[in-house]
A protein has these predicted regions:
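Periplasmic/cell-envelope proteins involved in peptidoglycan metabolism and beta-lactam response
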Residues: 1-276, 369-381, 488-491, 497
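Beta-lactam-recognizing serine transpeptidase/beta-lactamase-like catalytic domain environment
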Residues: 65-66, 75-78, 200-210, 251, ...
Length: 527
């Protein structure tokens, strides 16, 4: 009996001890939760009652004028279209096989691809599909699939397809502008997201709003591009490439008074609506050759050298020389293009005949220092600063590296590499009484609040005198009158222009050749 009572007593004491220990543990937890971690659990409770929703902002539009349809209206070349994307949180999906089956039919995707994407326990995976219509989004939402949700977003749309595509650039799937206007003005075009913070009940319904920040749409830009002129230029360029079996081509039209680019076209181009296809097949098409591709300009460089000689006073239009069909410089023989001796010529006739040997003589009168100085003043050693992504500066040996052969070949546009836009900008100085005007593509800025800002032209320095430009313009007019092709195309207009042909230089020296080891040439006309 005593043994039994002792056993019972021991057990009661042990039980009491355990109860007391548990009591103190429970008491500690209550103090910890209610006092020590009160803030943490209060925040957790509030977070379960709160919700936060992001409101998307629309990217700014890119607009142009149209001198034919309505000069006072704007026409969009790039704007946002609201669409939807479908997302999944794999660790919240209860039946992944069924989910993959349901989504495959709704999204027109392979069931296996969907299943492979969601067959994990991740909290985040990339969207299963973007660019859904409202009907598609509603069909998925109505299924109430666990772990699958719809997000509104904006997709960039280019209503004119390939028109001015390399000037515009494109917007990628993450909403980031690449190349062209889209890339250059990406931060301004991109709007600021808004958000709503509120409280919800146990069923997830909003019962009060705590704060709201409205989305701010992006800034819009009106370009200097004329839609009808751009379309006309692209059609003519495409036909010329086909007719002459050329690999590519570029056309730039610039307002010589304002610097505004009226048209800028290159072929081949791409459709920014389908930029992914181009990225996979030929991403080089994204690059705008008008501002990025370097080439040796050839004879279209000659009027700029003549302008330099006249402006510096080392020659006059009537200064004469006698020229053979070739000349030797530093051991190199330079020929006229037709291997023909033009004999006695004045400066105007040298330009009219496009005489390489005569141009070497012009360069001799200029000398290294003056020739280099004027080439720099015409802007060939720097970027033009146009408001487009991807511009390249011209290239030419440093003055201290020049020999006589450098000075000689540069007078007829070889040994110097430029972009098409640099050439156009330099020629606009000749048309603008010697004043350089910086090229640009934005005409007006439209801010999210509706206010507008007109972009003023930006003038550079006086490169040559007005008298010099008047003289050279008359020379270029004579060049057109003495020719046949340009003259026949410009009846009724007084046009000054110059044609040029040059080989394509290789990075390691020499010139590009085709499979038959024949030179590859670039043909140009400017005026």
């Amino acid at each position: 009996m005593d043994t039994y009572q002792k056993t019972i007593g021991s057990r009661l004491m042990a039980f009491s001890f355990i109860v007391i220990v548990l009591f103190f543990i429970l008491l500690y937890r209550m103090v910890e939760i209610g006092v020590l971690q009160h803030g943490h659990y209060l925040a957790l409770a509030e977070s379960q009652q709160r919700f936060e929703k992001t409101e998307m902002a629309s990217r700014g539009r890119i607009l142009v004028h149209d001198s034919v349809s309505d000069p006072n209206s704007y026409y969009p070349l790039s704007f946002d279209v609201k669409s939807f994307s479908v997302w999944a949180v794999p660790n919240q999906i209860r039946d992944k096989q069924k989910t993959a089956t349901d989504l495959a039919s709704l999204l027109s995707l392979a069931k296996s691809d969907i299943f492979n994407s969601i067959d994990n326990s991740k909290l985040y995976i990339p969207p299963l599909k973007r660019g859904l219509t409202l009907d598609q989004a509603n069909n998925i939402s109505n299924k109430n699939i666990s772990g699958v949700f719809i997000m509104p977003e904006y997709n960039r749309f280019y209503p004119e397809g390939t028109l001015a595509s390399q000037l515009l650039g494109f917007v990628n799937a993450d909403g980031v502008g690449n190349y062209g206007v889209e890339g250059h003005y990406n931060s301004e075009l991109t709007g600021k997201e808004g958000n709503v913070v509120g409280e919800k009940d146990t069923l997830g319904r909003m019962i009060s709003m705590l704060s709201q920040t409205n989305p701010q749409n992006g800034t819009s830009y009106v370009l200097t591009i004329d839609r009808s002129v751009q379309y006309f230029v692209e059609q003519k360029l495409a036909k010329a490439i086909t007719d002459y079996q050329a690999d590519s081509g570029t056309v730039i039209i610039m307002d010589v008074k304002t610097g505004g680019i009226v048209a800028m076209a290159s072929q081949p181009s791409f459709d920014p609506n389908n930029y992914k296809e181009t990225a996979n097949t030929d991403p080089a098409k994204f690059v705008n050759p008008a501002i990025a591709n370097l080439y040796e300009p050839g004879s279209i460089f000659k009027p700029l050298i003549v302008s330099s000689a006249l402006d510096s006073g080392v020659l006059t239009p009537e200064t004469e020389g006698v020229f053979d069909k070739s000349v030797n410089v530093d051991g190199y023989t330079i020929h006229t293009a037709e291997n023909k001796a033009f004999g006695r010529e004045n400066v105007a006739q040298i330009l009219q005949h496009s005489d390489n040997v005569g141009m070497v003589w012009v360069g001799d009168h200029l000398g290294n220092d003056l020739e280099y100085k004027y080439i720099s003043k015409f802007g060939f050693l720097d970027k033009t600063g146009i408001d487009l992504d991807g511009e390249t500066a011209g290239r030419m040996p440093a003055l201290k590296q020049w020999r006589d052969i450098n000075r000689a070949t540069i007078t007829f546009g070889q040994g110097v590499s430029v972009t098409p836009l640099q050439m156009v900008a330099a020629y606009t100085a000749l048309a603008n009484n010697g004043k350089y005007v910086y090229p640009h593509v934005v005409d007006k800025i439209i801010y999210p609040d509706g206010s507008e800002k007109q972009i003023a032209k930006q003038e550079g320095e006086q490169i040559v005198s007005q008298k010099t430009t008047e003289t050279v313009r008359e020379m270029l007019y004579s060049v057109v009158q003495s020719g046949k092709i340009i003259k026949s195309l410009t009846q009724g207009f007084k046009v000054g222009a110059k044609t040029g042909t040059a080989q394509i230089p290789k990075a390691d020296g020499g010139y590009e050749t085709n499979e038959s080891n024949l030179g590859i040439f670039i043909h140009s006309v400017i005026g």
